[in-house]
Amino acid sequence: MSTKVNLLTFRISKMGILTAEEKQFYKDNGYILIRNPFTAQELEELSTEYDDLFRRKNEAKTESSWVGSDETNRKSDSPYTVKGIHNLQMHHAVFGKLLYHDKLLDALEDVMETKNIVLHHTKAHYKPPEKGASYPMHQDYHYFPYKNDSMVAAFIHLDDASPENGGLCVFPGSHKLGPLEDVGVRDNSHFHYVDQSKFPIEKSTPVMARRGDVVIFSYLLVHGSPANLSARARRMLLVQYADAHDVPTAGERAQPARGLVLRGVNLYRDATVANRHVE
């Protein structure tokens, strides 16, 4: 793992507005680390409901490491695992409330350079101690390409994270390369990832995050994470956003509440009565 930590960190101001320096850092690097924008109560509520959600769901059907296929619930012989649950806002109101978090949306507005922000999807990944699976370096772009590449993710940490417990690692500036070869498709894999010899995780930049910290990053940024071999869990949840007026360039699976306006307006949303059931 690269020892160079190329991070600009800051605490969100009262209005959540980024400085010119912070905006430029994002443009140059494709990501930015925001120090905990949540209140102690907000973070505790998220943490409590996150743990309860994973406790009450069938673990055998929440495997989310990149093994097997969805048809078999990703069953494999690997001793390593990541448990995952999508569409968090459909499980508990606290996750729906998170989508409208003003300080987070303020920062997103500055990063995305739009006042019109919609939801794409949400998910949570739990890497257990000592056996948390790694994720190869990849671009989210290949899962849901959009015309104007407005898509960004907010990666929310519920635990302190570092390479030791499988924390996020990035290649700063890689978003400027645009869409890279999807080696996963070339290898006939069910998953999408870039050439690991060109983007080895050992040369990536680790994001050293604390509980409550948020990393906002472009879906073109090359990122991944090592295995969690530590005695600590790594809990995270992620919200994916897009400009309300950006559009997908390829067919994609339906996501509950995709297109939900979180801030601003969607001027292009069809209001035709006959199409009222169309996502």
Predicted regions and their residues:
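Catalytic core of non-heme Fe(II) oxygenases with the double-stranded beta-helix
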Residues: 106-109, 132-207, 246-253
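A structural signal for short, well-ordered beta-strand segments
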Residues: 122-124, 154-156, 237-241
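Non-heme Fe(II)-dependent double-stranded beta-helix
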Residues: 3-28, 35-137, 143, 183, ...
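Conserved double-stranded beta-helix
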Residues: 14, 176-279
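Short, solvent-exposed loop/turn segments at secondary-structure junctions
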Residues: 39-40, 124-127, 142, 161, ...
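Residues that flank catalytic or metal-binding motifs in active/ligand-binding sites
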Residues: 91, 120, 150, 164-166, ...
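Short hydrophobic-aromatic micro-motifs
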Residues: 33-34, 154-156, 215-217
